[in-house]
């Protein structure tokens, strides 16, 4: 599932190309994705100017000049790409936005696990996003903040940094990579982390996410940016997907385990912990 780096990459690839364009028409090829599409979607954003393209957590947000915003979640296999005027619609193209420059913005989703909503812009932070945690690349992620969220939590730190109520956008791949970089065992309980470990973890999360954004995100199967290009952070993965391979730091064997049904990869030597 696309996480913060993938959605940030998508935003970066679309923003400059979409701002000031007009949505001339919206065509719904079906009435539902993961959830039912609003029957008012076309009427509420047709003939409106695009003011901004931004991201919050794993959501892509397109703001219009009529105080509405389009919220896009890619789900497992969603793609949101710009296509030329002569583009021929494909099987899983579910929503088509005709733009004033002749191009088309296409939402394609093979598994139909993605979501598209349209809301009043001022509704987003007040209601839709009010339970989300801090952005990991912002100044809001501090030692004091994260310590306050971990200090009573006798839950593995891997689960906690993937909790969007604490920190948004640190998905499964980036959690394993960040914990490895910080040399913290994924099973260590949040309440047992020392201050220096929390500081190291914050630094590692930021470093991993920044590198992933620079590489255009991680494409394991479906993700592409708005220009239909894959991400290349896969080539920089240090532990994720490397079960039974040698650790790049110490040559120990990379271990694969599970946390809440999600695969976790770590080095038992570099991330050694006497207790969790």
UniProtKB/Swiss-Prot annotation:
The keyword Zinc-finger applies. Keywords: DNA damage, DNA repair, DNA-binding, Glycosidase, Hydrolase, Lyase, Metal-binding, Multifunctional enzyme, Zinc, Zinc-finger. Coiled coil: none annotated. One of its GO terms (molecular function) is 8-oxo-7,8-dihydroguanine DNA N-glycosylase activity. The active site is at 2 (schiff-base intermediate with dna), 3 (proton donor), 58 (proton donor), 262 (proton donor). Its cofactor is Zn(2+). Its EC number is 3.2.2.23, 4.2.99.18. Gene3D superfamilies: 1.10.8.50, MutM-like, N-terminal. Monomer. NCBIfam families: fpg, PRK01103.1. This is Formamidopyrimidine-DNA glycosylase.
């Amino acid at each position: 599932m696309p996480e913060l780096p993938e959605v940030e990459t998508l935003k970066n690839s679309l923003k400059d190309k979409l701002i000031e364009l007009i949505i001339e028409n919206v065509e719904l090829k079906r009435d539902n994705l993961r959830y039912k599409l609003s029957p008012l979607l076309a009427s509420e954003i047709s003939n409106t100017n695009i003011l901004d393209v931004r991201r919050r957590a794993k959501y892509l947000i397109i703001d219009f000049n009529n105080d509405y915003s389009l919220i896009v979640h890619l789900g497992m296999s969603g793609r949101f790409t710009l296509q030329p005027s002569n583009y021929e619609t494909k099987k899983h193209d579910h929503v088509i936005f005709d733009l004033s420059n002749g191009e088309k913005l296409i939402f394609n989703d093979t598994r139909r696990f993605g979501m598209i909503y349209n809301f009043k812009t001022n509704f987003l932070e007040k209601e839709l996003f009010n339970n989300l945690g801090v952005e990991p690349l912002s100044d809001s992620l501090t030692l004091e903040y994260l310590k306050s969220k971990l200090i009573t939590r006798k839950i593995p730190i891997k689960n906690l940094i993937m909790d969007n109520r604490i920190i948004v956008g640190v998905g499964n791949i980036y959690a394993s990579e960040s914990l490895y970089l910080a040399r913290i065992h994924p099973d260590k309980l949040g309440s047992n982390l020392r201050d220096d470990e929390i500081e190291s973890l914050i630094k590692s999360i930021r470093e991993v996410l920044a590198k992933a954004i620079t590489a255009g995100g991680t494409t394991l199967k479906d993700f592409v940016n708005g220009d239909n290009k894959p991400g290349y952070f896969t080539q920089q993965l240090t532990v994720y997907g490397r079960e039974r391979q040698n650790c790049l730091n110490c040559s120990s064997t990379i271990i694969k385990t599970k946390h809440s049904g999600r695969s976790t990869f770590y080095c038992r030597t570099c991330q050694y912990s006497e207790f969790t």
